[in-house]
Amino acid sequence: MRAVLSSMLFFIFSSTMAQEFKTDVSYKYMFSNKWDKAIQTYNFSRPFIETKQPLLIHGINASLSNIFKSSKRLKHGINLSYSYFKSSAENQNLNNNLNLHFFNLGYIFHYKNNEKAKGLYTDLIISAVSSGLFRNVNDEPFEYDDKKSKAFGIGGDLSIRAGYYLNLKNKIYLSPFVLVGYTPYIYSPNSEAVINQTKGLVSNDWNGIFTTQVGFTFHVTQQKND
């Protein structure tokens, strides 16, 4: 929580140096082989459940970005993002929910060249990642080894985003975008225990994640993107 508050304060401070402010919302798809295997093992080891536990693959993402003032085509900035995924399975006397949260603090390399490709831009985002995985059973926090079942993680992410500016009015833009991301390493040692009540059966303490996003960004700039 302290890290999140510190990141928010840093982001607010950085806004005083911003040339462009961006906020976006998107659909997010995630592929995590080890977490998928843990959920598949959960389903396989419980043949009595009629509704199988869905994989953690569909989610939403929201982010804020400040792009610093610069006359160069390649600009720099700060990005904060939050992602949420949910897996829910309702069975008789057993409603099982997995809630997965991600919080990223990243540094952006923002590039646009209106002389060659007017309206197009690309972002390279390098981020520190924190995660939290929680489980509820029948609307109550699930307990494992007499403790509330939860798993926290930390790692790093590299993302590439491409978008196109659409002018709404003077210095205000909307842009559709696509993003591809890769988290090569996220350390979350208790994730398997949260999902399947086992440790080391189908996954290690670390995990790799691939993501894709499709969404819209709202931009407010101090100068026109001409």
Region locations from a protein language model:
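Gram-negative (and chloroplast) outer-membrane scaffold detector with strong preference
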Residues: 63-144, 148-161, 166-172, 218
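Short glycine/proline- and aromatic-enriched beta-strand/turn motifs that initiate or cap beta-hairpins
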Residues: 18-78, 217-226
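Aromatic-acidic/polar surface patches that form glycan- and anion
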Residues: 53-57, 96-98, 151-153, 205-210
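Structural signature of outer-membrane beta-barrel domains
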Residues: 28-34, 83-89, 127-133, 181-187, ...
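Sec-dependent N-terminal signal peptides
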Residues: 3-14
